[in-house]
Amino acid sequence: DILKEDENVGHDFLAGVSKDWEKEAQQAAAKGVRVAVMRFGVVLGKNGGALAKMIPAFKMFVGGSMGSGNQWFPWIHLDDLMAAVRFIIDHQDVSGPLNFCAPNPARYRQLAKTLGEVLGRPSFMPAPAFMIRLAMGEFGDVFLASQRTIPDRLLKHGFSFQYPDIKSAIQAVVAE
């Protein structure tokens, strides 16, 4: 299923935090204040974020996907995230929940394959789910979850992504 802003945010720990946060934010909306709730995908950038943690493994020829690799991975390039925040500030008609993720979600195996291609390295060593959970505890489930999320409301309001696909985003991050 494709998750848009009007869908339920889920039932895991992070979903619970998001629901509570959004409920509190809506109190301001009830008083006439414009509220734009930002739901972030995984941010891709050179100086931090998911790729900064993955690139060293790929450079050492031990890169691969997480878990089965079939999970959908909602992501956004840092430049697009910043542009989307500016877009919301400049467009007073935009409010409510907004998915801050690229319009073309990728599966983890596609992310790993593309990162390997861009770096000129193989992508053959997946990190098993049990190792991710062991290393990251409950937060590991966040990386193993599958969310095919799209930024439906940003797109309907006319926002344009500089990096709409995973390959262009990874190429930009590696070139930074």
Show where each model-derived region lies.
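Alpha-helical membrane-targeting segments
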Residues: K53-W75, E117-S146
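Non-catalytic, hydrophobic alpha-helical segments
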Residues: L81, V85, F100, L111, ...
